[in-house]
Amino acid sequence: MTYLGSIEALLFVAGEDGLSLRQMAELLSLTPSALIQQLEKLAKRYEEDDDSSLLLLETAQTYKLVTKDSYMTLLRDYAKAPINQSLSRASLEVLSIIAYKQPITRIEIDDIRGVNSSGAITRLIAFGLIKEAGKKEVLGRPNLYETTNYFLDYMGINQLDDLIDASSIELVDEEVSLFSMDSINTEDKENNEN
């Protein structure tokens, strides 16, 4: 593993939230000055590589990967693709969480899902199904997300109250848990005892 590769991997996973200089320095066990040198190398590599669509963006000592302006038309065309063919299971999962828990931060979504949701959020914003809804008044002031009017149109509903009751969804989860390995193992033990 190289420092440049490690930085790139961290920034890719961090998504639109990016990472602070301090966070990366701690993760990579580098001094801030050594990390800045590596970040400058990575930024230069992206700027000079015509075959790369990426740039390294720094704002208030927070770094993230973004696409070059020359790829904007392509990305707009991609975002206009038919949604029913383009939404992944992860995107649908994130969209459901936002619909029922809005406004909600990416970190809160990640906690519910157990995995990073940056890519799905970016895609849902590009499709116009969700939007940023301000900042949460906590340390770091993370973005809040909520659904859009287009989401309501796409779902064929007039208001969020028209969504299926969330408690019925939880019931399905409870039913699914009946088939977990724990309940099967318990049944086997009971049968063996009889």
Swiss-Prot record:
Q: Quaternary structure? A: Homodimer. Homodimerization may be required to stabilize the binding of ScpA to the Smc head domains. Component of a cohesin-like complex composed of ScpA, ScpB and the Smc homodimer, in which ScpA and ScpB bind to the head domain of Smc. The presence of the three proteins is required for the association of the complex with DNA.
Q: Name one GO cellular component term.
A: cytoplasm
What are the record keywords, sorted? Cell cycle, Cell division, Chromosome partition, Cytoplasm
| InterPro entries with a match to the protein in the record | ScpB_csome_segregation (IPR005234), WH-like_DNA-bd_sf (IPR036388), WH_DNA-bd_sf (IPR036390)
TM region(s), chain numbering: none
Q: Does the keyword Cytoplasm apply?
A: yes
Q: What does this protein do?
A: Participates in chromosomal partition during cell division. May act via the formation of a condensin-like complex containing Smc and ScpA that pull DNA away from mid-cell into both cell halves.
Where, subcellularly, is it found? Cytoplasm
Keyword field contains Kinase: no
Task: Kindly give the NCBIfam families that the UniProt entry links to this protein.
Answer: SMC-Scp complex subunit ScpB (TIGR00281)
Which coarse location class describes where this protein primarily resides?
Answer: cytoplasm
Signal peptide region: none
Q: What is this protein called?
A: Segregation and condensation protein B
From the record, what ranges are coiled-coil? none
Entry's HAMAP family?
ScpB (MF_01804)
Q: Which SUPFAM superfamilies match?
A: Winged helix' DNA-binding domain (SSF46785)
Q: Which family does it belong to?
A: Belongs to the ScpB family.
GO biological process terms, semicolon-separated: cell division; chromosome separation; DNA replication
